[in-house]
Amino acid sequence: MTLWDLTQGASAKVSRFKADIENGYRTRLSELGFHPGEQIACVLSPRMGAPKLYLVNNTVYSLDDSIASLIEVA
């Protein structure tokens, strides 16, 4: 399952990044707290494919499907 698959109110731990993620994205996401073992919650999942809001370390980030689908969670 990917981060994009999380529904509003659900949470999961990051398990890994997909192999095809660009190094720049991997580095920046890790700096923001999206790293393996980190608990992440989906706080808002708007309709029509709009970016979702995720809570990581008391900070809320907006990610669209092209990025959130590269982060695998369990």
Task: Give names to the regions the model predicted.
Residues 17-20:
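A structural micro-motif recognizing beta-strand termini
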